[in-house]
């Protein structure tokens, strides 16, 4: 099996995945560096399957589309990357599938965003539709803060900042859950604890093992199916209404979760990739 490894910088996760691939005698790895590749619309690399591990969302998205156009199976697929890379599209997919999530409003102007914030109630969370690692999130506590943040986003922001994705603020009491879905199984989960309202390990949150209960597995698999399935990380909030899906990530990071959970996450990913799962 010739596995194309679509990547940018080789981080800890990529090293772990390459180590797991190297243990498979039937696998030949073909490195596809998105900083060096030149794509041809009429031909593609001689590989059977591609594992996408790009850092840049736009490169991942366009690279996957070009590779799939040549008939190459990609994990995750272009369709999944397209949905997961955009919080609005993710929210729509979850809504269509009936998967519980926090309340969301979308607005395109400062004036309509203020109406949306009044509707959803303060505090609320303002997010860029496209973004990762908990960056450029704003907890908006009142109308004065909202007016200031919206003006800054409108004047200083790119096109993406003119789409106002407004989410209900969920009181997490210092922690949330990240679960890991590989194909049809929720293989592991962690708690992420932080004194800050953004509980992201990239921003210093502490990881500890979270048991994969029937409830965690069910909502994680439902969220994964809603966006198209594959190898995905699902961020969950614990609330009095039950678990809610915050986000679904398609190029998942797991370096802090292997020892924490005792699960060989890269090994499970490679098994799924090589044995034909989508």
PLM segments and residue spans:
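Active-site nucleotide/adenylate-binding loops and adjacent lid/helix of ATP-dependent enzymes
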Residues: 1-3, 7, 68-71, 81-165, ...
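ATP-binding N-terminal substructure of ATP-dependent carboxylate-amine bond-forming enzymes
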Residues: 1-80, 84, 89, 274
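Phosphate-binding site of ATP-dependent enzymes
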Residues: 138-227
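A short glycine-rich, hydrophobically flanked beta-strand micro-motif that places a catalytic Asp/Glu
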Residues: 167-168, 229-240
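C-terminal active-site "lid" helix and adjoining low-complexity regulatory extension at the edge
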Residues: 225, 238-278
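Short glycine-rich anion-binding loops that position phosphate/pyrophosphate groups of nucleotides
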Residues: 55-57, 130-131, 251
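Hydrophobic beta-strand scaffold residues
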Residues: 28-29, 73-74, 101, 124, ...
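Protein kinase-like catalytic core scaffold
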Residues: 124, 165, 187-188, 232, ...
């Amino acid at each position: 099996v010739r596995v194309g490894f679509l990547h940018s910088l080789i981080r800890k996760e990529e090293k772990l995945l390459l180590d797991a691939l190297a243990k498979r005698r039937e696998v030949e790895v073909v490195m596809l560096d998105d900083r060096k590749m030149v794509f041809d619309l009429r031909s593609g690399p001689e590989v059977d399957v591609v594992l996408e591990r790009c850092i840049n969302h736009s490169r991942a998205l366009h690279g996957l589309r070009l590779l799939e156009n040549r008939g190459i199976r990609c994990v995750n697929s272009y369709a999944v990357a397209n949905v997961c890379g955009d919080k609005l599209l993710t929210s729509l997919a979850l809504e269509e599938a009936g998967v519980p999530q926090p309340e969301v409003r979308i607005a395109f102007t400062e004036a309509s965003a203020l109406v949306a914030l009044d509707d959803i109630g303060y505090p609320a969370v303002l997010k860029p539709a496209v973004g990762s690692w908990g960056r450029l999130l704003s907890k908006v506590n009142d109308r004065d803060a909202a007016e200031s943040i919206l003006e800054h986003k409108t004047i200083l922001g790119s096109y993406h900042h003119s789409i106002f994705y407004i989410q209900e603020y969920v009181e997490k009491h210092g922690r949330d859950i990240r679960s890991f879905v590989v194909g049809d199984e929720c293989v592991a989960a962690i708690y992420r604890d932080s004194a800050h309202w953004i509980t992201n390990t990239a921003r210093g949150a502490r990881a500890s093992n979270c048991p994969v209960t029937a409830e965690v597995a069910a909502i994680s698999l439902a969220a994964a199916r809603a966006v198209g399935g594959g190898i995905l990380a699902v961020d969950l909030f614990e609330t009095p209404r039950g678990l809610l899906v915050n986000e679904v990530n398609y190029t998942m990071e797991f370096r802090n979760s292997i020892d924490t959970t005792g699960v060989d996450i890269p090994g499970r990913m490679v098994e799924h990739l090589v044995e034909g799962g989508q």
